[in-house]
Structures are given as C-alpha cells and as structure tokens.
Amino acid sequence: MQRNYARSFLAMTATVFILMGVLLMWNWNPNTSASASRGAGTPAPGQPAWRLLDPIRYENLTIFPVVSSQDADTSDFATLDDALASGQAVVTEQGNYMRRTRDGAPDARAYSGAQVNQLVLVSRGKKPLVLLAGEVISGGKQDRIIGKDRIIPVGAPPLPLDVFCVERGRWTDGSAKFAGAKMMAHPSVREKAAVDQSQAQVWAAVRGQASMSSNLEVSRGASAGATASAGAPASAPPVLSSSQTAEVIASVAPTESYKQIYESPRVGSSVEAFAEQVERRFNRSTSGLKGERVIGIVVAFGGEVAWSDAFASSQLFEIYWPKLLRSYVVEALTRTASQENASLDDARDFLRPATGHYREETEPGVYSWRESTEGKSAQIELEALAPKPLTLHWLKVLRAN
C-alpha cells in the first residue's frame, strides 16, 4: 500500500515538474504563440504574437503579409494626413505662426525665419498625433518629409518639427500651410531620413530617381507573366522609356519635386497600375483570414528582403497601407528587374531583432523612440507611453550602404 502511495506521489511530482517546465519554456519568450511552430518570429519584444503569410509576388516586388490574432486598440491616436485635412493640426514655415503664451499674449521667443529642416507644428486635436518618418507634406517654400517617428501629445504648445526637403531648387512661397500629400517617400529616400538623418543624402536619393528609367523599359512587361501569380492577369503596368522618364524629370526641373515627379501622368500611371496588380493579389491572399488581422508587411525586391513596416493594430496598418504600398512600388520600379525571389525563410530571418548598437530618445510620459543597428540592418521602434506602453510602429530596413 505504501509502495503504491509512493509511486503515485512520485508520478504526481514528476507531472508537476514537467508542467512547470513547459510553462517556463512557453513564457521565456513573451511573444510565443501557436504560430511559433511554423517558424514565425516577432517584430519586437512585447508585441503581439504573429505569423507570416505566403508571399505575394508581382514583377520584382514580393510582399509577405504579417498577421496577428491580437489587435490593439489604437483609436485614441490621430494620423498626420487626417489631422491636417480636418484642421486638427497645422504645419507652417517658421515665422508664419505667432507663438502665444497661455494668457494669449505674443511670445517674445516667436520663431524667426523659415528654415529648410525645421517647420512649426500646432496640434489642436483631442488625440495624440502620430508622425512617421518619410510622410510627405506639401506647401510652404518647399515640400518636405517628416524626419523621424514621434508622437505629439494633446495640448502641446507649437513645436519645432524636424523635416527633410524633397524639392530642391524652389524656395518661394507656396501655400502658407502644409497639407498632407497622402504619400510616403519610397524606401531609398525614407531610409536617408529615418536612419541616416542627412539632408544631403535625402536630396541625392530624390535626384537619383532619374535612374528609374533603366528599370522602366518595355522589357519589364515581357517578364510580368513569369512572376505573376497563377490565375492572375499577367499584364504589366504601363512603362516609360529612358527618354520619356528623363523628359518627365526635366519638366519639373529645377525644383526636382518628389511629389510632382510621382504625380506626373506618365510616371504616376505606371505606379498606379503596378499598385493595383499588387493590391488585387494582396486582397485575395488575406480575404479568408479567420481570427487574425493584417498588422504589417515584409518587403523584398528581387531576391533581397529589404524592408518591413508593422503596427500595433490592423486599424493603423489599413490607414497607412495605401501610401506604403505605392512607396514600395516606386522603389521596385527604380530597382533592376530580377527573376530571383525571396523565400518565406528569408523574410523570417530578416525579422530577427537587431542586437547591435542601440540608442533611445524619450519624451517622458509621451513616447520612446529606439534604434538598433547591426551590420547593414537598422531597426526603429516607436512606443507610446500613455495611456499605457504600446509599440505603435516597428520598422526594419536593410540599408543600401
């Protein structure tokens, strides 16, 4: 009898230790989920568990949707395009806005003159305002792009806004206020702002788009059928010859306006046609999801995984997706046509967190901006600190140089 009790006790003890071991292994990585058995990783510690869907391919662009069963509530945050359109935010050149004290009197420290790399942002809304590096705003003396991910708190006084110019040559008054262009600078330009934070390199990247002509040859259309998904239309987007593209670039000289180049009828039609093909495949790939939502993407050009944008919620992703997609398309059009394709394993490897040089900037009680660089990889996280800590945006890029 005692022997049986002893055996039962030992068996129960062993079971308890096994269960404890399983729980400890499960909790070692706070992002572990059922998808981990499929090899999916996580964008950043503390983010919801997620997995990658099969790749969506068109021409030399491959997109891997990132889906999650956990979807944060981000409805308490406003985005730049919406805030500018509704008047909840105003962006002007320095010197165009009179700063006032709390009692309404003019502030003697009012901003002096216009500056290339700094504007003034006034937030009047009742929600914190989210800004992402690379968002294009048009107006003032030159079109600009936002220089860094950040959050503007409710009730903030007029703030200096770090930006980069994407319209070299013009320095004359346009609209007094800036408007959201509903555009995101494509990765080659966005990287120079978000990671390198260099005006000279941003300008060089914008000017370098003349080289897109070498990748907009009619020969690209011949390869579309080889890379199109089964059952999908194989037609290629309208393309421009080298001379046609050079003509478009020349027509907007000397301002070298990023916005004008990519809104021109000929270049713009190529971008839109390309984007429609990708979006059709994307919608078909993600339409049957059950209990999961798309929160981000991993992007490859040819066989090289080069970029990823992920968000805390499907709501934020859906807001940014249209202009993100077109930015990836512009990048694909500027890159050499390739028959190589990145694999799902390549995308998973790319999402391995960078563990090299680390730096952090924090506005207490508002947000934390973190950057990690390792080799050619750079990873940036924007975390809201109120009303509770939440990583709103996660970016990883394979730097060009």
Question: What is each residue range found by the language model?
Answer:
Residues 1-6:
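N-terminal secretory signal peptides that target proteins for export/translocation
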Residues 7-129, 134-401:
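Intrinsically disordered, low-complexity segments enriched in small/polar residues
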